[in-house]
Amino acid sequence: SFRFFEEIIMRLATLLGLSVLHLALCVLTCTAHHPGLEKSRVSYENMGDEENAEERSCVHERETCSKVRGPLCCRGECICPIYGDCFCYGS
């Protein structure tokens, strides 16, 4: 009878482990498909002195920005909602 309980405990532990792995995979997949779930960071191009701000190809507040494509960075933060285009916030 002890063997029976041991087998049940092993099956439950395996099921629990697989459930945790499945949940982690779902979270990673969701984050990959919806990058707006993570607050975007200021582009490296923005990390400079204020003197040359006009020379950088950055857009202004409430204009569309992009973290991935081209030079469309923000002077503030590029916020990407789950649905719709990314937009600049702040300056």
Swiss-Prot record:
Any GO CC annotation of this UniProt entry? extracellular region
Q: Does the keyword Signal apply?
A: yes
PTM section of the record: Contains 4 disulfide bonds.
Q: Which UniProt keywords apply?
A: Antimicrobial, Disulfide bond, Ion channel impairing toxin, Secreted, Signal, Toxin
Instruction: Give the propeptide segment as residue ranges.
Output: 33-56
Tissues with expression: Expressed by the venom gland.
Predominant subcellular localization, coarse grouping = secreted
Asked whether the keyword Secreted is assigned, the reply is yes
Annotated localization: Secreted
Question: What's a Gene Ontology MF term here?
Answer: toxin activity
Please state the span of the N-terminal signal peptide per the UniProt entry. Answer: 1-32
- Residue ranges annotated as transmembrane are none
What biological function has been recorded for the protein in this entry? Answer: Putative ion channel inhibitor that may also act as a antimicrobial peptide.
What protein name applies here?
A: U1-theraphotoxin-Agm2a
- This chain's source organism reads Acanthoscurria gomesiana (Tarantula spider)
